[in-house]
A protein has these predicted regions:
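Basic, amphipathic juxtamembrane/active-site segments
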Residues: 158-167
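Polar-ligand-bearing catalytic/cofactor-coordination segments
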Residues: 1-7, 68-159, 177-249, 307-319
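Substrate-binding clefts and substrate-entry loops adjacent to catalytic sites
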Residues: 171-177
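Hydrophobic or amphipathic, alpha-helical segments that drive membrane association/targeting
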Residues: 1-107, 246-319
Length: 319
């Protein structure tokens, strides 16, 4: 299994496990909603329950909003590009010979050089006329090898699934960091496929070099679920040096994510039937006191995860 696939499997497993724990917490606390609405918060346990429920609802809402934004952005992108679609020139037909891409390449009239793989169940490759005009035949074929890798792996669909979990599980910020590694590693593996198919690094490196001056001008939207040929420093370094990428997870995110899940499990235990055992403890450690620590961890993880989710938006607006 390749590193990107392992990262995706870990991300998916962590996301499903986290979802199960947080869903159990939500179901445990849900019966208190009617009581809170009827009589208000009477003690610290009620306050914690209300705040945790609010965090859960925010996570569900954020995940659904992210999913629908991605779907809507993809639909709008496709609609806009279809209106600019032109016939494939002989240069593209020659470059795609033997790649099993018949009927799956779209060429759009656009002054920005870009290429990307899009759509879910049956992915397609989109090229711009500016890209085709700038690249030599061997460079264009290397780009098609790169995008074909994404197409065969159905990477746009994987991106949608991963981004949904990263947004919905914002109280587990390490999921978002795994998503970032998975996305970059996928690009690196697509590069490696293009290099192998081209018999060397020269063709793909030439294409990336020609795209580099336009890297800041090409934007396909904040949450568009496509796999685009983006030029990044990490990819160029890997292409030149051949050094594998390291999984750079923030220690703070790892600690907060683990703490948040442990805290959620403790809250489930305290509120889900184990509270009788906790009530025998001294007052400092009794049930209301036990709720404060885990809830504080959840809130800290939520703040860190929320900052992770806002980072792409702030970079897009102010970067």
């Amino acid at each position: 299994m390749k590193r990107a696939d392992r990262a995706f499997a870990i991300l998916l497993g962590l996301a499903l496990g986290s979802s199960a724990i947080l869903l159990a917490l939500l179901l445990t606390l849900a019966p208190r909603v009617e009581q809170l609405l009827a009589r208000g918060a009477e003690d610290i346990a009620d306050v914690v329950a209300a705040l945790v429920l609010l965090l859960a609802l925010c996570g569900i809402s954020l995940g659904l909003v992210t999913l629908f934004r991605q779907l809507a952005a993809t639909a709008l992108l496709i609609r806009r590009l279809v209106a600019q679609k032109v016939a494939l020139p002989p240069s593209v037909l020659r470059a795609s010979e033997g790649l099993d891409l018949d009927g799956r390449i779209d060429l759009v009239a656009d002054g920005r050089p870009f290429s990307f793989c899009y759509w879910f169940l049956r992915p397609r490759i989109c090229l711009s006329t500016a890209l085709v005009d700038r690249l030599e035949p061997d460079e264009l074929r290397a780009v098609l090898h790169h995008e074909r890798y994404h197409l065969r792996q159905r990477d746009p669909l994987r991106q949608v699934v991963a981004r949904y979990f990263a947004a919905g599980l914002y109280v587990v910020p390490v999921v978002d960091e795994l998503l970032s590694f998975h996305t970059l590693q996928k690009e690196v593996e697509a590069d490696q496929e293009a290099v192998r198919a081209s018999g060397g690094v020269r063709s793909l490196a030439g294409a990336l070099y020609k795209l580099l001056p336009y890297a800041d001008d090409v934007s396909l939207g904040l949450l568009v679920p496509v796999s685009s040929l983006s030029v990044t420093e990490a990819r160029i370094d890997q292409l030149v040096a051949g050094q594998p990428l390291s999984v750079a997870l923030s220690p703070v995110s790892v600690v907060l994510s683990g703490g948040a899940l442990i805290a959620a499990a403790v809250l489930v235990a305290v509120k889900g039937g184990a509270s009788v055992a906790f009530e025998t403890l001294p007052p400092l450690y009794a049930v209301p006191g036990l709720l404060v620590g885990p809830a504080s961890l959840l809130f800290a993880a939520a703040i860190d995860g929320g900052l992770h989710q806002l980072r792409p938006l702030t970079h897009r607006l102010f970067g």
